[in-house]
Amino acid sequence: MLSLYWFSTSFHWAAILIITLPSQAAQIAGDEFKGRGLGLILAIGALVSMIAAPFIGAYSDRIRTRWGRRVPFIVIGVTMNVLGLIALAYIPRPGDYATLTPYIIAFMWVEFWNNVASAPYSALIPDLVPPEQRGSASGWMGLMTMLGNFVGGVTGLLMGMLGGITGVYWLLIVAMIVGAAGTVLFVKEPLAPEPKPFNYRNLAGVMTVFGFAALGAIGLNALALIRVAPNDTLAKIFGTVNCFDG
């Protein structure tokens, strides 16, 4: 059960980034501006993740509640994440560029609250698993992540059966609730020791790593878009000539 949520959140992001986000960006902004809209959404989402994850993870290390250190973040984060998914499902109006702003706000909401749940959740392995078993636990985490990515990627083949993009979002909602419920109900946190004095140097190091990771993610997404639509995407996002064409 410890790795179940990794499947849910990996499925969640794979389906959004591969299926719903590109489709909705095209619907909202139209073919002419879909690259610009998609690039803007991805860049803002990466920035939100870069800022939120390390601070939330560090904060969850330092709080003490009757329900544990991580569970409150998972419950609140997934609940708010689900509300954001509902907004993403129903906000966009095809061909109406004015709905791009509320869509970006909803996407930022989902990105932030998913980090609220996922950053503390990622600390459950060192919290719960003895050092000699962490390799196995990490292997299960990797397996569930790959399965989630795979299932999220092929969900597009089921869009007709699911009723389109809205149905995909409701499937993601169910997956997130099931993953969070499995963790909250069946994974018991140990009593936490008193927190050590806060180390700002460590936080600065983590922020640096997340910053480079976010920049890398933005670059990889841009390159992926270029390869898929070489005559459209780069010019729409950056307003430059596509040097990758031909």
Give, region by region, the residue ranges found by the protein language model:
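Helix-loop boundary and gating motifs at the non-cytosolic
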Residues: 1-46, 220-246
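C-terminal ends and interior cores of transmembrane alpha-helices
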Residues: 74-97
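C-terminal membrane-cytosol helix-exit motif in multi-pass small-molecule transporters
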Residues: 174-193, 214-222
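Central cavity-lining transmembrane alpha-helices of secondary-active solute carriers
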Residues: 38-63
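Intracellular juxtamembrane helix-capping segments at the cytosolic ends
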Residues: 21, 25, 116-129
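Transmembrane alpha-helix termini and helix-breaking/packing motifs in multi-pass membrane transporters
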Residues: 89, 93, 151-167, 222-233
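Glycine-rich segments within core transmembrane alpha-helices of 12-TM secondary carriers
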Residues: 44-50, 135-160, 176
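Loop-to-transmembrane helix entry/capping segments in MFS-fold secondary transporters
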Residues: 32-36, 131-140
